[in-house]
Amino acid sequence: MATYKLCSVLALSLTLFLLILNKVNSVETISFSFSEFEPGNDNLTLQGAALITQSGVLQLTKINQNGMPAWDSTGRTLYAKPVHIWDMTTGTVASFETRFSFSIEQPYTRPLPADGLVFFMGPTKSKPAQGYGYLGIFNNSKQDNSYQTLGVEFDTFSNPWDPPQVPHIGIDVNSIRSIKTQPFQLDNGQVANVVIKYDASSKILHAVLVYPSSGAIYTIAEIVDVKQVLPEWVDVGLSGATGAQRDAAETHDVYSWSFQASLPETNDAVIPTSNHNTFAI
């Protein structure tokens, strides 16, 4: 009898352990990492002027044969697989983190260089939108929920809808009119490191920009309800654009890019992600 009870207790304990383990592991994850870029990489979709150089640099906007950036140029790159960012059945939302390094070089002083680059999430199979100050992800400056697009922009030109401070970081929700901005000082031609994190539980989107060359650090954060902004499945990408006037141009070079997202399959699932208040760069 004692042996039977012991077996029953062990069986029950094992069942509970498996249930807990299943709950911990009930998380849908996706991740990718490019420490450099390779021409012909099937995991990336290049749009517009975007190309990958033989030296492993992702150029979002065109460089002329004389080595100078071209005006009126727009380019984007998308991760080739869609990301499940929230689930309609369970109501769960993914936490995510992306990191990338880039540089912007402005060889011209007149007219003012333009326009910037942006990390964005939006509907799958989308095509580049208007360039210039719309950065390839919007077609006008109106607030329009049909865009279903979220972006973190690094804007170098003050358009009529922008704050007077440029350059600035902006959080864009269904509009190029940022819901929050933070000025930063462009370190011309120097590499910047970016970390963008979204914590689904607090709904806080947080971005950090660091210039290792100068030690300058810039941060921005805002509450964003991803489920009210984005479709269930999204493309994630980087987009850049130059200005509409001759020589209103700059380079938008990306050297590395990583992304990870964790979507719990139930509201009780444990998400094994890093501390979203920690920003190691």
UniProtKB/Swiss-Prot annotation:
The answer to whether UniProt assigns keyword Metal-binding to this entry is no
* PROSITE patterns found in the cross-reference section: LECTIN_LEGUME_ALPHA, LECTIN_LEGUME_BETA
Q: Look up keyword Cytoplasm and say if it applies.
A: no
- Tell me which domain of life the UniProt entry assigns to the organism this sequence originates from: Eukaryota
Q: Name one GO molecular function term.
A: carbohydrate binding
Q: Where is the signal peptide?
A: 1-26
Pfam families, per the entry = Lectin_legB
Q: Which UniProt keywords apply?
A: Calcium, Glycoprotein, Lectin, Signal
Oligomeric and partner information: Homodimer.
Function field: Galactose and N-acetyllactosamine specific lectin.
Q: Which PANTHER family match?
A: CONCANAVALIN A-LIKE LECTIN FAMILY PROTEIN (PTHR32401), LECTIN (PTHR32401:SF45)
Task: Spell out the protein name for this chain.
Answer: Lectin
The record lists the organism as Erythrina corallodendron (Coral tree)
